[in-house]
């Protein structure tokens, strides 16, 4: 059989496989929790990278639910299946990955809209009638920050320094706002997901379809994949430890809402992150995991790869929770990445750690993914060479699909998600070696530490999530470190 060659029988087999996979995940979860098994992990390290789908990174990994044989996509709805997967290099274009983009790609479960979602007029034409949720005003406060004023009531907030946002400049190559601190806002200032341009998605949607000829040469990379020649370290981790092939982003859309799910099991109905030419400044009123950790005396730290880690941005929304506005009590818990290495060597690593990259090391297109891969590898090597290896679990995830193709329709557990699959690696002496097919999302990370420390769930999302316990085998002989060097 030729690469990617399959037919209707293959589709039916794949659907049967997915059904069996879901049933098995529920059985595994029940068996693990019913045993009341203790968890000999004392340090959880969550490394969060950027913007790649599962099929983009592991679509050809042996044993994983990867790119189907014969996979092909149309350039426009109802068009011929003329586009096929291509092997990409270390640098890929940045594709749209807003709420609307994800809905266009999803196409009611057909998973065939990745090309037409990228046309400049696609949102105006094809997105007509797609509802866009608005933030719950009881959970999210939206304020416009301009160059002339800081929103009232935020002057005492450590992260309210206007230079962090008002000096951000639109980078036409990266298609992002990039600030002096090195972070990016992934959405165009004319983002129709928010603000007065919402009417583009309703009765006033554009009457003319996108062109179907002369597509940009970079567009083909939305249907691309990488292999072990491009990201060899990640593939080595996948072979040596655990690869999850049913790990979904928590909602369809960009970074900020998914990072909120990562720490709070909700986004307050927020599905976007900026628009209308102004930096949109949010304050969040709902609880998050660090509240639970603090109340339970579980140590934690957020390590951030920017010049001032206390500044809130789309990959680190913690400083923008309203409860920290006048009393920035979480300041000792937010540190630069260098502090992570110090904590490893000084024996002061907290029980729960999050690692958020700089833009250069994030793998966010068009950044070189190998630069991000080696940043992650250095972190993993440092843990493996420390005293913490014997008692740790390192979980590496990517925060959203980045506009890249994935063939698995995400389960629609509520109006917000799941979003598309993203890669997830579990690296631990107790990793269950191989591919785990259990369904997870970012709230599964919350469920894991809630289970370990007997914490109450934050929302129904983490209450109902699988906790990733079946990624571990606590009765096995502990696995040795796998040190990777250049």
List PLM regions with ranges.
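N-terminal pro-sequences and low-complexity stem/linker regions of secreted or lumenal proteins
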Residues: 35-486
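Exposed boundary/loop context
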Residues: 3-5, 29, 237, 437
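Basic polycationic patches enriched in arginine
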Residues: 12-15, 35
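N-terminal secretory signal peptides that target proteins for export/translocation
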Residues: 1-13
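N-terminal signal peptide c-region/cleavage motif recognized by signal peptidases
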Residues: 31-33
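Bacterial N-terminal signal peptides
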Residues: 17-29
């Amino acid at each position: 059989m030729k690469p990617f060659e399959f037919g209707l029988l293959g589709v039916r087999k794949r659907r049967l496989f997915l059904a069996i996979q879901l049933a098995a995940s529920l059985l595994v979860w029940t068996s693990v929790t019913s045993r009341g098994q203790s968890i000999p992990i004392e340090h959880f390290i969550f490394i969060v990278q950027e913007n790649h789908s599962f099929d983009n990174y592991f679509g050809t990994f042996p044993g994983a639910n990867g790119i189907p044989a014969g996979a092909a996509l149309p350039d426009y709805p109802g068009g011929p299946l003329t586009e096929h997967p291509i092997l990409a290099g270390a640098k890929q274009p940045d594709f749209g990955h807003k709420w609307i983009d994800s809905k266009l790609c999803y196409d009611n479960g057909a998973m065939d809209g990745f090309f037409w979602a990228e046309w400049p007029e696609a949102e105006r034409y094809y997105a007509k009638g797609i509802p866009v949720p608005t933030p719950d005003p009881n959970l999210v406060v939206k304020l416009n920050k301009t160059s002339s004023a800081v929103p009232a009531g935020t002057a005492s907030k450590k992260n309210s320094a206007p230079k962090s946002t008002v000096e951000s400049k639109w980078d036409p190559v990266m298609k992002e706002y990039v600030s002096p601190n090195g972070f990016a806002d992934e959405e165009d200032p004319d983002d129709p997901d928010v603000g007065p341009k919402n009417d583009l998605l309703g009765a006033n949607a554009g009457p003319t379809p996108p062109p179907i000829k002369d597509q940009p040469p970079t567009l083909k990379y939305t249907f691309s994949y990488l292999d072990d020649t491009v990201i060899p370290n990640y593939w080595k981790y996948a072979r040596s430890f655990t690869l999850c092939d049913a790990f979904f982003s928590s909602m369809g859309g960009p970074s900020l809402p998914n990072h909120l799910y990562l720490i709070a099991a909700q986004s307050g109905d927020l599905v976007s992150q900026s628009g209308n030419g102004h930096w949109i400044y949010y304050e969040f009123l709902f609880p998050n995991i660090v509240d639970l950790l603090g109340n339970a005396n579980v140590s934690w730290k957020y390590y951030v790869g920017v010049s001032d880690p206390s500044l809130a941005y789309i990959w680190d929304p913690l400083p923008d929770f309203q409860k920290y506005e006048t009393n920035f009590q979480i300041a000792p818990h937010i540190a630069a990445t260098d502090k992570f290495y110090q904590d490893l060597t000084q024996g002061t690593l907290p029980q729960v750690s999050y690692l958020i990259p700089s833009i250069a090391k994030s793998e966010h297109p068009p950044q070189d993914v190998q630069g991000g891969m080696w940043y992650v590898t250095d972190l993993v090597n440092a843990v493996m060479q420390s005293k913490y290896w014997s008692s740790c679990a390192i979980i590496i995830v990517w925060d959203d699909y980045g506009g890249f193709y994935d063939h698995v329709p995400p389960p629609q557990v509520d109006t917000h998600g799941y979003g598309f699959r993203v890669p997830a690696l579990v690296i631990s002496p107790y990793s269950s070696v191989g591919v785990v097919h259990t369904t997870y999302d970012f709230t599964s990370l919350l469920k894991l530490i809630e289970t370990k420390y007997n914490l109450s769930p934050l929302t129904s999302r983490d209450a109902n999530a699988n906790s990733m316990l079946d990624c571990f085998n606590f009765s096995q002989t502990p696995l040795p470190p796998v040190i990777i060097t250049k």
